[in-house]
C-alpha cells in the first residue's frame, strides 16, 4: 500500500469511526434524556433526530466500513443474492437520510411559523403521532423506490468497469456488487430519477426551508419581544430559538455541501468521464462520509441538553480512566511501604 493511500485510508477511517461513535452517542443520550422526563416520551424533534442518526449509523456500519476495509487491501465478495439485499439497503438508508434531514429542517420551520402551539398531553401526543406518521411514510416510500435493486444488481469478481453509477448506493463496486440493467437507457432513466427524487429535490427543498426558517425565526423573535415576557425569560427564549435554528441550518448546510460534491462527481462520470472523473470521485468518496462523520458533532455542540449530557458522560469516563491509572500507583506505593516495614 502506498504512503498516499495509507494517509487517505487513515483520514477516511477517522471519519468513518467518528461517525459511528457519534451517532451511537447521540442516540443513547436522546433516549437517556427521555427517561429523565416526566412524560418519558421523545420530543418530536428528538424523534426525527434519532431516525437521522439511525439511518447514518446503518449506512456507516454496512456500507462505509466495508469501503474502509477494501481501502486497506482486504477484498470481500458477496454472492449475487446478498449483493441484491445489500444494494437495496444501501439505496434505502441513503435516501432515508436525505429525507429525514429535510424533515428535521421542515419541522423546525413549521414550529416557528405555527400560530397556535399544541399544549397539554393530548396536544403533544397528537404532534408525536403526526411526526411518526411522516417518518413511517419516509421509510416506506424509500423502501419501495429501492426495490429495483433486488432485480438489477449482480455480482462480479476482480476488476470491473462501472458503466453507470447510481448515486444512492456507492461510487464504485463494493463487495463485488454492481448495477446491471438490460439496456443503458433503462439504467440511465433509473439513475436520473434517483438523482432527481433522492438528491436534487431534497437539496432544493432544504435550501428553501432554511430560507423560510430564517424569515420565521426573525419574525418569531420580534413577536416574542413585543409581548409581555420578562427580560430574563425573553433572553432565554430568544437564545433557545436561535440556537435551535443555527443547529438545524448548520446541519443542512453541511448536508448540502457534502451531497452537492457527490452529485456533481457522479453526474460528471455518467455524462462525461473525462480526465477529472477519478479526482472528482475521490472527493465524492470523502464527502459522502463527511456528513455522516460530522453531523453528530454539529448536533451535540448545538443541542443544549445533548451537549450537557455528553459532556457529563465524557467527564465521567475521564474520571474513571484517571482512577484506573491511579490504582496501580497506589498499590505500588503500598507494597513499598510494606517492604520497608518488614525490613525494619
Swiss-Prot record:
Its main location: membrane. It is found in: Cell membrane. CDD domains: 7tm_classA_rhodopsin-like (cd00637). Probable olfactory receptor. Residues 324-337 have a biased composition (Basic and acidic residues). GO terms for cellular component: plasma membrane. This is Olfactory receptor class A-like protein 4. Gene3D superfamilies: Rhodopsin 7-helix transmembrane proteins. Keywords: Cell membrane, Disulfide bond, G-protein coupled receptor, Glycoprotein, Membrane, Olfaction, Receptor, Sensory transduction, Transducer, Transmembrane, Transmembrane helix. It comes from Danio rerio (Zebrafish).
Amino acid at each position: 500500500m502506498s504512503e498516499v493511500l495509507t494517509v487517505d485510508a487513515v483520514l477516511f477511517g477517522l471519519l468513518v469511526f467518528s461517525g459511528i461513535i457519534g451517532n451511537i452517542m447521540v442516540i443513547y443520550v436522546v433516549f437517556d434524556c427521555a427517561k429523565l422526563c416526566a412524560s418519558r416520551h421523545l420530543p418530536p424533534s428528538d424523534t426525527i433526530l434519532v431516525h437521522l442518526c439511525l439511518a447514518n449509523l446503518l449506512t456507516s456500519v454496512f456500507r462505509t466500513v466495508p469501503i474502509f476495509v477494501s481501502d486497506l487491501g482486504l477484498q470481500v465478495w458477496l454472492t449475487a443474492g446478498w449483493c441484491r439485499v445489500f444494494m437495496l439497503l444501501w439505496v434505502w438508508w441513503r435516501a432515508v437520510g436525505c429525507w429525514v434531514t429535510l424533515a428535521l429542517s421542515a419541522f423546525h420551520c413549521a414550529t416557528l411559523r405555527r400560530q397556535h402551539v399544541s399544549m397539554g398531553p393530548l396536544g403533544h401526543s397528537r404532534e408525536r403521532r403526526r411526526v411518526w406518521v411522516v417518518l413511517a411514510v419516509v421509510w416506506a416510500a424509500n423502501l419501495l423506490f429501492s426495490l429495483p435493486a433486488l432485480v438489477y444488481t449482480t455480482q462480479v469478481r476482480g476488476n470491473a468497469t462501472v458503466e453507470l453509477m447510481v448515486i444512492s448506493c456507492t461510487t464504485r463496486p463494493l463487495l463485488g456488487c454492481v448495477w446491471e440493467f438490460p439496456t443503458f437507457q433503462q439504467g440511465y432513466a433509473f439513475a436520473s430519477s434517483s438523482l432527481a427524487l433522492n438528491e436534487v429535490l431534497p437539496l432544493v427543498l432544504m435550501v428553501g426551508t432554511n430560507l423560510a426558517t430564517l424569515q420565521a425565526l426573525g419574525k418569531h423573535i420580534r413577536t416574542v419581544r413585543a409581548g409581555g415576557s420578562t427580560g430574563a425569560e425573553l433572553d432565554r427564549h430568544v437564545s433557545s430559538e436561535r440556537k435551535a435554528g443555527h443547529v438545524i441550518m448548520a446541519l443542512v448546510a453541511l448536508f448540502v455541501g457534502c451531497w452537492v460534491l457527490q452529485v456533481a462527481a457522479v453526474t460528471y462520470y455518467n455524462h462525461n468521464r473525462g480526465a477529472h472523473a477519478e479526482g472528482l470521485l475521490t472527493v465524492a468518496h470523502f464527502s459522502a462520509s463527511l456528513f455522516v462523520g460530522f453531523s453528530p458533532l454539529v448536533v451535540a455542540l448545538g443541542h443544549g441538553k445533548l451537549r450537557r449530557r455528553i459532556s457529563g458522560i465524557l467527564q465521567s469516563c475521564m474520571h474513571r480512566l484517571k482512577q484506573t491509572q491511579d490504582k496501580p500507583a497506589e498499590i505500588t506505593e503500598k507494597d513499598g511501604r510494606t517492604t520497608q516495614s518488614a525490613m525494619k
